[in-house]
Curated annotation (Swiss-Prot):
Belongs to the bacterial ribosomal protein bL36 family. NCBIfam families: rpmJ_bact. One of its GO terms (biological process) is translation. GO terms for cellular component: cytoplasm; ribonucleoprotein complex; ribosome. The lineage of its organism: Bacteria, Pseudomonadati, Pseudomonadota, Gammaproteobacteria, Enterobacterales. InterPro entries: Ribosomal_bL36, Ribosomal_bL36_sp. The gene is rpmJ. Pfam families: Ribosomal_L36. Coiled coil: none annotated. The keyword Transmembrane does not apply. It comes from the Bacteria. This is Large ribosomal subunit protein bL36. It comes from Hamiltonella defensa subsp. Acyrthosiphon pisum (strain 5AT). Keywords: Ribonucleoprotein, Ribosomal protein.
Length: 38
């Protein structure tokens, strides 16, 4: 999981999700694309 100031979709399978006020990106295709804003 990457922690970044600005999170962006890295491929078309990435999904933006907001959990408890934290923006996250999850990807079913490429687990390396997981990100969290912080």
């Amino acid at each position: 999981m990457k922690v970044r100031a600005s999170v962006k979709k890295m491929c078309r399978n990435c999904k933006i999700i907001k959990r408890h006020g934290v923006v996250r990106i999850i990807c079913s295709d490429e687990p390396k694309h997981k990100q969290r804003q912080g």
